[in-house]
Amino acid sequence: MTDQTSLQYTAEHEWVLIDGDVATVGITSYAADKLGDVVFVELPAVGDELAGGSVVGEIESTKSVGELFAPIDGTVTEVNDDVVASPDLVNSDPFGAGWLVKVRFEALPTLLSHDEYVALVGE
C-alpha cells in the first residue's frame, strides 16, 4: 500500500503518485467506499492522449456508475489489466493493487495535498 500522505489528489477523488514524468492514478478509498462494490472498470487504452479534467473511463458498482476523470494532460503508458479483470481490487486495495492507469506528462497541474484532500472530504 502506498503512503497516502505522499500522494496528490483531485476534487474528483482520484489520487496521483508522481515518479519522474509518469503519474500513477487511482481512486481514493473515500470514492471506493461511496461507490460500494465495484463490478466493472473501463479504462483508456495505452497510447491514448488524455486532457486533464476530461472523462476517460467509468467505474460501475452495485450502487451506481461513476465517471473516471483524467487528473492531468498526458499519454497513457500503462493500464492495470488486473483491475479490469478483477474490479473488486478498487475496493480491497485502492491505493495499491487497485491503481488504474499510468500517464506520462509534461506539466503537472496544481493538485491537492493529502491534508487538503482530507479537509475536502471531512475524514
Swiss-Prot record:
PROSITE patterns assigned to the protein according to its UniProt record, in alphabetical order: BIOTINYL_LIPOYL, LIPOYL
A Pfam family: GCV_H
Cofactor binding description: Binds 1 lipoyl cofactor covalently.
InterPro entries: 2-oxoA_DH_lipoyl-BS, Biotin_lipoyl, GCV_H, GCV_H/Fam206, GCV_H_sub, Single_hybrid_motif
GO BP, sorted A to Z: glycine decarboxylation via glycine cleavage system
Coiled coil (UniProt feature): none
Matching SUPFAM superfamilies: Single hybrid motif (SSF51230)
Lipoyl-binding domain ranges (all copies): 22-104
CDD domains assigned: GCS_H
Cofactor(s) this protein requires: (R)-lipoate
This protein's UniProt keywords: Lipoyl
Domain of life assignment: Bacteria
GO cellular component: cytosol; glycine cleavage complex
Modified residues (N6-lipoyllysine): 63
Oligomeric form and interacting partners: The glycine cleavage system is composed of four proteins: P, T, L and H.
Family: Belongs to the GcvH family.
Role this protein plays: The glycine cleavage system catalyzes the degradation of glycine. The H protein shuttles the methylamine group of glycine from the P protein to the T protein.
HAMAP family: GcvH (MF_00272)
Protein name as it appears in the record: Glycine cleavage system H protein
Source organism of this protein record: Clavibacter sepedonicus (Clavibacter michiganensis subsp. sepedonicus)
